[in-house]
Amino acid sequence: MTASPAGKPAGGRERAAQVRTLFSEIAHRYDMLNHVLSLNIDRRWRRRAVAALGWERAPGGSYLDACAGTLDLALELAARPGFRGRVAAADFALPMLVRGLPKIGRAPVAPVCGDAQRLPFAGESFAGATVGFGVRNLSNLQAGFEELHRVLRPEGRLVILEFAVPPGRLLRAAYMAYFNHVLPLVGRLVSGHPWAYAYLPASVRGFPAPEELADLLRRAGFAEAVWFPVSGGIAAIHVAEKARRPGAAPRPGR
């Protein structure tokens, strides 16, 4: 795997190998760095993402968390009062999943080592799916969305939590200064990895804006795709829904 000193993301298969190696190498410090560098605000974002999933429509259903990392988002869903289902937590970086294993306890979460662009599940397997800070790392974004659409049942909902660039001039300037300078420096010092946290701002700068991402979701087959900003627009939550089967009655709770 190769990477520039600035952590510029590669493309295609090289990008996939780069991302897998990167997250495998920082798995041991990933949780701590996430919480510290986000000032713990990432926990609130995950709660809002789970709330947007609408799991109450099928509380005993099967759910997918793709690009699951160390399992925080999967466990957030599994811990909701009234949730009686199961969560398959898929990630192609095995060390990240291993790092999350001690958190599981009795939670109904099953880690699966698998690529979000080639998920090891049959079509229409899940009542809903989540992706937290993961779609930005896919080597083929459209293929990933089409694969998530494939494994969702009709009326299944996909919720994506991802970084964004805030629209306000002052907040954007402060955010980009932190993202481009403070975060890579602190991340490098704490993780010991020479370029992992330089990759993050580079990947965000090259990522589609929320409006473009919603359009890509529609092209992948989702009937509805909306988004809303969180924390002033430094992140966004996208909600997309697979179409109902023709002639089928609406799912209860809509």
Name every feature range the model reports, one short phrase each:
Residues 29, 39-60, 76:
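Conserved alpha-helix/loop element of class I SAM-dependent methyltransferases that forms part
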Residues 30, 129-130:
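Hydrophobic beta-strand segment of the Class I
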Residues 59, 83, 152-157:
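Short glycine-dipeptide loop
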Residues 62-118:
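Class I SAM-dependent methyltransferase SAM/SAH-binding core
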Residues 117-128:
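A short acidic, Gly/Pro-enriched loop at the edge of an enzyme's catalytic core
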Residues 142-154:
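A short glycine-rich, Lys/Arg-flanked "PGG" loop and its adjoining helix->strand segment in the class I
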Residues 161-216, 220, 226:
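C-terminal alpha-helical "lid/dimerization" subdomain adjacent to the S-adenosyl-L-methionine
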Residues 223, 229-254:
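Core SAM-dependent methyltransferase catalytic element
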